[in-house]
Amino acid sequence: NISADWPQPDTQEGISIVDLTNYPLDNPGTVTVSRQDVMLGGLLLVNEWHSRPSDFDESSLVSIMTYARSMGVTKSIWRNSDQRLFPVAANALLDALNAAKEAGLEGYVVREAYRSISDQQTLWDAEYNRLKGRHSAWTDDELIAATKKSINLPGTSEYNSGLAFTLYLYENGNDELNKMVFSESEQGKWMYENSWKYGLVFRFPLQDFPTKGTVSRAYKTGVNVEMNLFRFVGIPNATVMHHLDMCLEEYIEYLMAHPHIAVFEDGQLKYEIVRQQVGDDSSTFSVSISRKTSNYTMSLDNMGGLITIYEY
């Protein structure tokens, strides 16, 4: 699958990323894609500066409880039966928890998952009004700035993506486990180190959080609060983000600067990732693809781009 004129990976061991920005797609073709079909591919950026698209469709969300039970999970990994995620994220969560269980680690529970815009508005209003009651002299701008420190404006929270969730530890009657701080527990450490293998990334790195030596990305993510929040991006993207130590904002910027990359593992081509600018205005668009493999997925990034991930 490797083109003769491609640069060679710099190592035959582990992950190696080759920049193919100046190399065309092999065996090129074109497909027509609908926005809705690629909205939830995993790379939709939702943050303080990039609000969830107005045509976002939440109809395929599933109850974590119902989904987990349908997959044979008997242990309660949900805090309540109302918690929802999109199936791709729920699946990645279950895969990660199964792997943790095989490593002897259990007790993970989802603290929070999808929030609708109206749920987010309710939380926003409550915090805004609480602050207003305590600081009657503050201007509206001051109140908004203060509210933003703990609650995102509706549409700008990662919880509004349906691809993210927070975790904590709880087992009925297990006082020792229930007292544990997630980030200091073996369960937490395992999840931080291994979640990328299942397509999940730790979303909001801060200085020395979740682990010592972590460099803060708050200036990129806009979030400066310690949260054990994991976000589904898909295994190929999580692999690159882990290897390059990038948050989601940095990864999308990286693909804007390097819109065609190949990812090798132990010298073998594993993924090819291509970003094309398609804009946010069309409900369908024409996309260039490589017909070298039919095994590919696509995702909008909410920055006007469409990212195609080929798996070999």
List PLM regions with ranges:
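Extracytoplasmic cell-surface/polysaccharide-interacting catalytic and binding patches
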Residues: 1-312
